[in-house]
Amino acid sequence: VGSEMCIRDRFISFDMEREIGKDILQVEGLTKTVDGVKVLDHVSFTVGRNDKIAFVGDNEIAVTTLFKILMGEEEPDEGFIKWGSTASVSYFPQDNSAFFNGCKLSILDWIRQYSKDETETYLRGFLGRMLFSGDDIFKNVDVLSGGEKVRCMFSRMMLFQSNVLILDRPTNHLDLESITAVNNGLSDFKGNVLFASHDYEIVQTVANRIIEIADKGCYDRQGTYEEYVLSLIHISEPTRRV
């Protein structure tokens, strides 16, 4: 099978159940200490319609902590967040172990618990996009490989049809064809995306805004990652990695 066929077979498409309004997210003065280290220090930004924001910086824990606060999984020490009334959010965590460890459900029954439509035909449609077909869907999720678990998480995310996607390094454990499918799906998505990734191509292709979580506050620039790096060079600041 040629690479083009492999890329086509892995089909990721994020649809929205409803359009998003003008006011999406306000983040004001977020401060958070983790294990004695201040990872967020008065971080403030707002998210507008059509924003696809890549969060970058040297401290991965800072971005993961920010995403957990946005999802209500952690509380900030200071500051607040306010989601718009029309925002519906799906979250792809960096650590998905809580979804699978000790779970004795089949892939089909695992995805069924997140769906309004529980029919096998409907659910097979979402699983099939991530190459779960035939008897694959009856495999227990607790024995899946890292890549298979990531594919399950993407099936779940597509199922929700949210208008805001938050993804924390979603391409870990994926092969090149699957990464390309993720890139295409996020690029084509009509809603908002807040994400972090080690994959340069996804950051460069998907993001139209870059927010770097700094030691104090954050740096916020419109444009691609390449434009962001060039702006840092222009003002003689050290180039920061994704």
Give the residues covered by each predicted segment.
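ABC ATP-binding cassette signature C-motif
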Residues: 17-236, 240
